[in-house]
């Protein structure tokens, strides 16, 4: 057993307190994710204005729409897909975004679905671009580049918050014994960090490679969608399935099933992008 294995015993997920409000590292990590994505996008606009002919003010307005769509979609998606008491929230809709518990204590909003956030993002992007759909693919490509590195901070936030834990490390896994984290007296894979690397860093490199080798608008978001789906599918083998969900057909987790649907959506965007490139 090394110091890394027991890091959760030595780490407080609460960064600091403001009166009765506890600020978690989780929240700070997500703030870093948003800031990273925002400035990464601005850098791309400045560096490649021909590919991303968007004014800063225009992008700032779009970014607000996209963020709102992501938050709404992620939270509602979690309620519909993962929340065992979804019927309660559907009849008490205001509770979906209530950051206080029954005692009035600030606990934040917990329970977000990445795939739900993706749906919300696509809807928000379409609504914002509906008056000029020619810009839709430009916006999507821009987010495809700026999102992955921000996503890394999001998964680090999950790790610091000690949630979305990994599967139990087999006793015969030498690497697992080294990188595993003790959770409830069981050594588990640090699945959040595995996801940060695969779904963040690797997907970012995929999109940057595509940016270098293609000029067709819409292909970057397609590469992102397909790359993320593949990396998430792999990472799910190290992540403990949600206790209320378990596994399904062929022992696939809900995350893997939703990633397969994401492939279909990505191929649909590919058809749309290919069709528009010929106009």
Swiss-Prot record:
A 1,2-diacyl-sn-glycero-3-phospho-(1'-sn-glycerol) binds at residue 155. Keywords: Cell inner membrane, Cell membrane, Membrane, Transferase, Transmembrane, Transmembrane helix. GO terms for biological process: lipoprotein biosynthetic process. The chain crosses the membrane at residues 14-34, 62-82, 106-126, 136-156, 190-210, 218-238, 252-272. It is a multi-pass membrane protein. One of its GO terms (cellular component) is plasma membrane. The keyword Cell membrane applies. Its EC number is 2.5.1.145. It is found in: Cell inner membrane. InterPro entries: Lgt. Signal peptide: none annotated. It is an enzyme of class 2 (transferase). Pathway: Protein modification; lipoprotein biosynthesis (diacylglyceryl transfer). One of its GO terms (molecular function) is phosphatidylglycerol-prolipoprotein diacylglyceryl transferase activity. Belongs to the Lgt family. PANTHER family: PHOSPHATIDYLGLYCEROL--PROLIPOPROTEIN DIACYLGLYCERYL TRANSFERASE (PTHR30589:SF0), PROLIPOPROTEIN DIACYLGLYCERYL TRANSFERASE (PTHR30589). Catalyzes the transfer of the diacylglyceryl group from phosphatidylglycerol to the sulfhydryl group of the N-terminal cysteine of a prolipoprotein, the first step in the formation of mature lipoproteins. This is Phosphatidylglycerol--prolipoprotein diacylglyceryl transferase. The lineage of its organism: Bacteria, Pseudomonadati, Campylobacterota, Epsilonproteobacteria, Campylobacterales.
